[in-house]
């Protein structure tokens, strides 16, 4: 199973990635357990203390860039969308908040459709 975590180098993204690595498999109702083969951590920056595991792939880029989103979603089985500009930053830079929080989400959903 290949997993994409947008906002993957943020606090929650790193915690989620580590938990998934610890689990090693995911099981969905009515299906056999599936091994986690790759976790793509996608964010605007590399971040610190990213889990070190050969199954981790770190990709930096803009969540609102169609080419980047097409590349990181290619072959993905599961997506956790955590990328966001938090409230105070979005209020300080409204255009950035709209670009990431709205347009980035819309692009991701459209690409996955």
Regions found by a protein language model. Give the residues of each.
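Conserved Rossmann-like nucleotide-binding pocket used by diverse enzymes
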Residues: 4, 40, 59, 98
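Short mixed-charge
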Residues: 22-42
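Conserved cofactor-binding/catalytic machinery of classical short-chain dehydrogenase/reductase
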Residues: 65, 104-107
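N-terminal Rossmann NAD(P)H-binding glycine-rich loop of SDR-like oxidoreductase domains
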Residues: 1-29
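Short, well-ordered alpha-helix to beta-strand connector turns
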Residues: 36, 55-56, 76
């Amino acid at each position: 199973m290949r997993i994409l975590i947008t906002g993957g180098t943020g606090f929650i993204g790193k915690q989620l990635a580590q938990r998934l690595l610890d689990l090693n498999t995911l099981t969905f109702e009515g299906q056999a357990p599936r091994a986690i083969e790759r976790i793509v951590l996608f964010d605007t920056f590399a971040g610190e203390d990213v889990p070190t595991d050969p199954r981790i792939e770190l990709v930096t880029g803009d969540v609102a860039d169609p080419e980047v989103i097409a590349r990181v979603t290619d072959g993905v089985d599961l997506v956790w969308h955590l990328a966001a500009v938090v409230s105070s930053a979005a209020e300080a830079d409204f255009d950035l908040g709209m670009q990431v929080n709205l347009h980035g989400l819309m692009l991701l959903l459209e690409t996955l459709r």
